[in-house]
A protein has these predicted regions:
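Non-catalytic structural scaffold of enzyme domains
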Residues: 1-286
């Protein structure tokens, strides 16, 4: 059977829609879950198109529009774009296309990094599309004057994390090649500019050592979601823990296993298919 729509009334806890190209956005979802347990969460992992970071901004924008439409159709009242690439490619356009829906996106945490660096050198690990987007350039221009910004795209890292190999030999090699040149230039603060990367935090910290601060923006994004919910009068701080519903455009069975492994939780996972440029939910036999 299909997952039921999640109808919303003013007396209910407003459902929160969250999406990413894969499991990366779960790093954001877990913080939202911890801060807003009384709100239903609807998460979509567009794993058939992962990674977004090597795709054109136009492609990512089209995916983001349709995923947003799908999540709203499932009852989401607020959309968290838990993907740096999708935020860079589509956040502004999404707000124009869906003017009645509040959006929370991922902004590279350059501002806190620039304010706390002592060496004046900040590293950013992100995807090519994130660096190409106007959002990154704008954040650097506004908040990192006088700070040296070192960038690395970590090619192949998202794929390794999606495969559950964030601590594997290949992921370690990718990260070492990205981070070692930064260390040689006295970097003392590194920003994780992709929501997949917090799942490789142990490996990153082993390479950087204790003297480098690694900034994961996920908790700040969750706090912003709380502020937006409060602003719209939708915040429900007490009540029973509401359900989490997951959708994937790839294998629901594999995603169920990944979620259990990385979050130590079990949630219902439903399959959706891209039919042309439209997402269609697949019948599921329970």
């Amino acid at each position: 059977m299909k997952a039921d729509n999640l109808p919303y009334t003013s007396s209910d806890a407003a459902p929160i829609g969250i999406f990413d190209s894969g499991i990366g956005g779960l790093s954001v979802m877990r913080h939202i879950r911890a801060m807003l347990p009384a709100h239903p969460l609807i998460y979509l992992a567009d794993q058939v198109h992962v990674p977004y970071g090597t795709r054109s901004l136009e492609e990512v924008r089209a995916f983001s529009f349709e995923i947003t439409r799908f999540l709203i159709g499932k009852g989401a009242r607020i959309i968290v774009v838990a993907c740096n690439t999708a935020s860079a490619a589509a956040l502004h356009s999404l707000r124009e296309q869906f003017p009645d829906v509040p959006f929370v996106g991922m902004e590279p945490a350059v501002k806190p990094a620039a304010s706390q660096t002592h060496s004046g050198v900040v590293g950013v690990l992100a995807t090519p599309a994130t660096f190409q987007g106007e959002l990154f350039a704008s954040v650097v221009e506004r908040f990192a004057q006088g700070v040296k910004i070192l960038k690395s795209t970590c090619p192949g890292l998202v794929e390794e994390i999606e495969k559950g190999r964030a601590g594997g030999i290949k992921a370690r090699r990718i990260l070492k090649e990205a981070i070692q040149p930064m260390l040689e230039q006295q970097v003392d603060t590194i920003v994780l500019g992709c929501t997949h990367y917090p799942f490789a935090l142990d490996t990153i910290s082993e390479i950087t050592g204790p003297d480098v601060e690694v900034i994961d923006p996920s908790p700040a994004v969750a706090r912003q979601a709380v502020r937006v919910m409060e602003q719209f009068g939708w915040l429900k701080e007490t009540g029973e823990s509401e359900e989490v519903t997951i959708f994937t455009s790839s294998s629901s069975e594999l995603l169920t296993k990944k979620i259990s492994r990385i979050l130590s939780e079990t949630y219902p996972v439903y399959k959706v298919n891209w039919v042309g440029q439209t997402l269609v939910e697949e019948d599921r036999v329970d």
